[in-house]
A protein has these predicted regions:
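Inter-blade boundary loops/turns of WD-repeat beta-propellers
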Residues: 29, 38-39
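A short beta-strand motif characteristic of beta-propeller blades
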Residues: 2-9, 42-47
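Conserved beta-strand positions in repeat-built beta-propeller and related beta-rich domains
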Residues: 10, 26-30, 66-81
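Beta-rich, blade/repeat-based domains predominating
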Residues: 7-21, 50-63, 67-71
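Repetitive beta-architecture junctions, highlighting loop-to-beta-strand starts
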Residues: 2, 32, 82-87
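Extended beta-solenoid/beta-helix repeat architectures
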Residues: 29-32, 51
Length: 87
């Protein structure tokens, strides 16, 4: 495997990627937002999610699926955190 290109991430803690025809979907563990970028790294859109401590993402069937880590020391807790891992 060979690295052919790197792009700047639109977020501080990228923790999930999914490439689609619409661009690269990047899950941010810190903000729980999903950022969609093109192949140059240009931000196309930001999608707020109800995810808590996001750790994974996939896109399909017209849906955006994310997963939560549950409790973590990776970022400060928020009042909306459940402390549970869920999809």
């Amino acid at each position: 495997m060979k690295t052919v290109k790197q792009i700047e991430t639109p977020c501080e803690m990228p923790n999930g990627l999914q490439w689609t025809d619409d661009g690269l979907f990047v899950m941010d563990q810190k903000t729980d937002n999903v950022y969609v970028v093109d192949e140059t790294g240009k931000l196309l859109r930001t999608i707020p999610t109800p995810t808590a401590n996001g750790s994974g993402i996939t896109v399909g069937g017209g849906f955006l699926w994310t997963t939560s880590n549950g409790n973590s020391v990776s970022r400060p807790s928020r009042s909306t955190d459940t402390g549970l891992g869920y999809i």
